[in-house]
């Protein structure tokens, strides 16, 4: 039986050695953002001695005259239109409570989802009694943020056929700040797997289906055995995402695909070794720079 022993070493993060974080204006609590009184105070800032000061550690974002600080490490703060992946935690009267990595549990109303088969009608008492047959505790779903309440709680909906219960796959939890906002967060990668990049930091990796079960209305999960080749692709993608997160790189379809291709010379179990992880991420970053430039 082979045994490998590794000793801890003083290793600098890849971002420090590359020194490429100069584009972002990073601040810590107490830093002065600006002394100009013409700007408006946003989230993560406060006024002190006629200066705008940061109250959290993060990156400064400006929208016209509004300045706010986006925290680097925080729980998910919902916005209307966000795509999220969540887990059902409780079945209540005419609603489900969903864990979405936010401060409060999110809510999915019975009236905010498609009925099995995509039937369009008013929800009846029979539908309410059958709620646990639709979704029960522990089920994973993909949904869209419909509304955000004053206390920060999020209301979800799954009215589109692309949302609904998730079948077989792997869930990876990352910081929401590392998921890049795009027009679409559902990606079928050419390597044979698909990913759902939730804005809440929950990433779902699953084998690409041969045909879409649109007539099921998002309730029938495919429980057929997953082939060994698909499981290896999913495992490699999972380790690649963890590698990108460890080196604080943004997650989107191109960065994940480039990292997957860079990891092909290595075994799946070796991807998480620090030296191989840095090699793969550095090659990924170089390809992204060549694409941008």
Swiss-Prot record:
GO terms for MF: 3'-5'-RNA exonuclease activity; 7S RNA binding; RNA binding
Disulfide bridge partners, by residue number: none
Start and end residues of each S1 motif domain: 79-159
Compartment(s): Cytoplasm; Nucleus, Nucleolus; Nucleus
UniProt keywords, alphabetically: Cytoplasm, Deafness, Disease variant, Dwarfism, Exosome, Nucleus, Phosphoprotein, Retinitis pigmentosa, RNA-binding, rRNA processing
One cellular component term from this protein's GO annotations in UniProt: nucleolar exosome (RNase complex)
Entry keyword annotation includes Transferase: no
Residues bearing PTM Phosphoserine: 124
UniProt GO BP: CUT catabolic process; exonucleolytic trimming to generate mature 3'-end of 5.8S rRNA from tricistronic rRNA transcript (SSU-rRNA, 5.8S rRNA, LSU-rRNA); nuclear polyadenylation-dependent rRNA catabolic process; nuclear-transcribed mRNA catabolic process; poly(A)-dependent snoRNA 3'-end processing; positive regulation of cell growth; RNA catabolic process; RNA processing
InterPro entries: Exosome_cplx_N_dom, Exosome_RNA_bind1/RRP40/RRP4, KH_dom_type_1, KH_dom_type_1_sf, NA-bd_OB-fold, RRP4_S1
Described purpose of this protein according to its UniProt entry: Non-catalytic component of the RNA exosome complex which has 3'->5' exoribonuclease activity and participates in a multitude of cellular RNA processing and degradation events. In the nucleus, the RNA exosome complex is involved in proper maturation of stable RNA species such as rRNA, snRNA and snoRNA, in the elimination of RNA processing by-products and non-coding 'pervasive' transcripts, such as antisense RNA species and promoter-upstream transcripts (PROMPTs), and of mRNAs with processing defects, thereby limiting or excluding their export to the cytoplasm.
Disorder named in the UniProt entry: Short stature, hearing loss, retinitis pigmentosa, and distinctive facies: An autosomal recessive disorder characterized by childhood myopia, early onset retinitis pigmentosa, progressive sensorineural hearing loss, hypothyroidism, short stature, brachydactyly, recognisable facial gestalt, premature ageing and mild intellectual disability.
Quaternary structure annotation from Swiss-Prot or TrEMBL: Component of the RNA exosome core complex (Exo-9), composed of EXOSC1, EXOSC2, EXOSC3, EXOSC4, EXOSC5, EXOSC6, EXOSC7, EXOSC8 and EXOSC9; within the complex interacts with EXOSC4 and EXOSC7. The catalytically inactive RNA exosome core complex (Exo-9) associates with the catalytic subunit EXOSC10/RRP6. Exo-9 may associate with DIS3 to form the nucleolar exosome complex, or DIS3L to form the cytoplasmic exosome complex. Exo-9 is formed by a hexameric base ring consisting of the heterodimers EXOSC4-EXOSC9, EXOSC5-EXOSC8 and EXOSC6-EXOSC7, and a cap ring consisting of EXOSC1, EXOSC2 and EXOSC3.
Entry's family note: Belongs to the RRP4 family.
Full protein name: Exosome complex component RRP4
Species the sequence originates in: Homo sapiens
Organism classification: Eukaryota, Metazoa, Chordata, Craniata, Vertebrata
């Amino acid at each position: 039986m082979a045994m490998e022993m590794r000793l801890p070493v003083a290793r600098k993060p890849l971002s420090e050695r590359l020194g490429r974080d100069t584009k972002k204006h990073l601040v810590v609590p107490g830093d002065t953002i600006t002394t100009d009184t013409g700007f408006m105070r946003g989230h993560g800032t406060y006024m002190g001695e006629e200066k705008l000061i940061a109250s959290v550690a993060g990156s400064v974002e400006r929208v016209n005259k509004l300045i706010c600080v986006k925290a680097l490490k925080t729980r998910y703060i919902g916005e209307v239109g966000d795509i999220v992946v969540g887990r059902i935690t409780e079945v209540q009267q005419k609603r489900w409570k969903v864990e979405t990595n936010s401060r409060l549990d999110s809510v999915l109303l019975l009236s905010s989802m498609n009925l099995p088969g995509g039937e369009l009608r008013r929800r009846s008492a029979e539908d309410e009694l059958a709620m646990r047959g639709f979704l029960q505790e522990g089920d994973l779903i993909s949904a869209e943020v419909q509304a955000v309440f004053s206390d920060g709680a999020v209301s979800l909906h799954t009215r589109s056929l692309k949302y609904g219960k998730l079948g077989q796959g792997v869930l990876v939890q990352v910081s929401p700040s590392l998921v890049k906002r795009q027009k679409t967060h559902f990606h079928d990668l050419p390597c044979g797997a698909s990913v759902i990049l939730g804005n809440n930091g929950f990433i779902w990796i699953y084998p690409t289906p041969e045909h879409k079960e649109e007539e099921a209305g998002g309730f029938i999960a495919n429980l057929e055995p997953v082939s060994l080749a698909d499981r290896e692709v999913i495992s490699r993608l999972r380790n690649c995402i963890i590698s990108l997160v460890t080196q604080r790189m943004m997650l989107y379809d191109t960065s994940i695909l480039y990292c997957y291709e860079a990891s092909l010379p290595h075994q799946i179990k070796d991807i998480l070794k620090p030296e191989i992880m840095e090699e793969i991420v550095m090659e990924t970053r170089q390809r992204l720079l060549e694409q941008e430039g």
